[in-house]
């Protein structure tokens, strides 16, 4: 069986990501057109509307997407399709889009199973019924944990007591119908209750039909046909069965009655339905569908307005705050062009009705600043002068070129996007403020849809098909990041599987189908939705996994479709690091700075940046960025803006990086075809590096602001299979009409297409560059405080605590070395702290850098509560001995062992062996007989150097002793393996043999299978480039080594040093049990 045969019939998205939903629908519509032949007799078939259908948002139940379901319904000639996911509207917006694309009417509904077993579907009839359905779902979801719901009859009755229901109820009788269930539903919904007859050829359908019709007549309840649809087509049954097995955590072979007996729960052709149901029941479904007139797109949303004080309108209050912010930002008066820009923006904001949204974001930022929480806006909102005046963003509009259309325009039919970063350790305070301010009834986080990826899908599928755990692990590894461009067939074969095995083929085929299939809802990283009325009237709300969090059932794409505004409160670790560093500098060094008041354009800082001495700083710490820095040689702030943006897939794939560097280095002349283009591209030497520049170029050519924004969207869509050809034709015509040469037009368009692979807006890059400069200045001038703050902000960033400490201790020609003291129970707090040194007095008298005392937070297995007890007891009086420590700090066995293994007791008892012995005999209480003689101390020999280093890494994650490679250096010399110092003395192009600890593996999407590896020895980091053919040949050594040896060619060009690997092999055996952290494929 071939690979293509195995996945025949399995829908696959285009490579590189999912297409926009509308295009996905269109593609599947075309596929369905090929699948179903429309005959002239179609009009004579019975009409039908499917009123009970689950999509893939009935997680692990429905096998098909809304797009697939509507495409199928369209070609079967259905008049309507109800999406009735179980106690959920999570997939309903996708249903709306699919309905628009196909013309098949969408009916909004949901399926429920009550605690007593009663099953029914609610369908929305009108605008009154929609909030009723949302409220029922919310009640059920809020009464249970994440991913579950709980509803009883009392809760349902309470929602419809004393109100006219705006919904219809379809009773779903079981195999043994209980008339009392139907009677109860009829009491609640009266004539709006119906009996759904669902026939699936699983038993005697004729007998069941007769029994259900008699039951309906007995109850005085109308009956209609429905399908309990769980898949678009019959061939999807294997996927539905697999999802059932995953849901029940059973192998398929053990699922038994959990599986459907056949594939009848698909959208069946009307001819088949006409042979199964009486035409009257089919017609009843159509008639009920016609009564469901609710249009989801007409849902009204009102933003909260309580922030507006009495006597003000939202517009007048926003203007007042903006003008006050202008006076604060520009004490001497704002420039005339800024005033004009702000007036223009306020007029546009009022026209779009977004004043309350801006006021909300400003209020959240105001709260954070009042609490001392660092925050900063980013993204396209940094194009707004109003956002700058309000203190939301940090990019001064008088110092940069703004393009408001990138953020908001009159023609743009979608909400503005304002992203604000907060310290990652304190963002929860901000989220809880929003909940408190607006109430949990009116505020909730947006959802994120967690979808299957290759690795997670194959794990679940293989388990469902009964593969043993060891084989599942092998198969899952075939989908790992490190496989590069190795064909899947080769990966499978190398893992020891036979592609001719039908079981393996079936697992792989189902896995392919489940790629991007929704698995569950999670919470968005920080997107808040706030409403003037209870959110549960607008969209169902459910509990998140985290305590004190609630989420709505729609994700950010749904919100955009429904034109709902969200406030993005995001978490950024570097803000935590900078705030902690500034606190340390203020408290220990006597320098009171904020990000805004740090000395600007500091030559020493830029000199450090040019040497790529940027471990731990913001954004420019990655391998690719560090390789760019010596070539670009930033000398001013705008260079940092370019640096942030240039190492992105868009500029790389658009072939903008090398031309820019050649022009910057003087190897290529800079020219412009017109003054208009020079005005747009002058600062980037004629090369478009930012999204705003692309939009400005086409506006210059004749596009409107709205058309330019549509081009931006098309650029992103092009990467996922969209069509850029209409834009190519129009841009060519417009620019040719302005006299531009065809070569220039083609070059510009190719660069435009490159932005489809992700390019930064300049506003976003400028916002990030502020933090780049701040972190670099602190690293250069306050290296101890910066390293300490960085350690205290972990986990974050690219580098482990070990690498941060190694870098601080090593120093550089541009930066002082920092002394680091070990963890010590007599001196360490929870956090790492600064000790010693002398305060800063002036640039002429900068004082002396302090040392860092490692904190007890670095100790594996030691909780913060235990450390709080240790510090509190130590503050009362010094510890007399180990027994006193254990007694007064109430240390349990786990804490005692953690302290001993970490070497945190050496100042009390000597070496690590002595500490282990002492802790082994201690209890956290005094002896029963106070006069009992103390046990005689035993003198134990100190561990060997290698044992100490191994224990350090195991217990603390780092070592202040010799670097492991220093211990191994004699063996390296025997093998003629060089260290970094010897390597740096070699000429460009030399053949070399090196080895080091693996600290990073990266495979950028633009690298065509090339893997970049960072090795570390006692002198620093070695950057290794592994071409795809070698990565495939030496995959195991490349991906599994802790200590990797490389033979290759040493290269040094424009200050950038790296090793081109010719061969590599694993030396991890030399490390013994030592486990070292490596940051792989992030």
UniProtKB/Swiss-Prot annotation:
It is an enzyme of class 2 (transferase). It is found in: Cytoplasm. Keywords: Cytoplasm, DNA damage, DNA repair, DNA replication, DNA-directed DNA polymerase, Nucleotidyltransferase, Transferase. One of its GO terms (cellular component) is cytoplasm. Its EC number is 2.7.7.7. GO terms for biological process: DNA repair; DNA replication. Coiled coil: none annotated. NCBIfam families: polc, PRK05672.1. HAMAP family: DNApol_error_prone (MF_01902). This is Error-prone DNA polymerase. It comes from Xanthomonas campestris pv. campestris (strain ATCC 33913 / DSM 3586 / NCPPB 528 / LMG 568 / P 25).
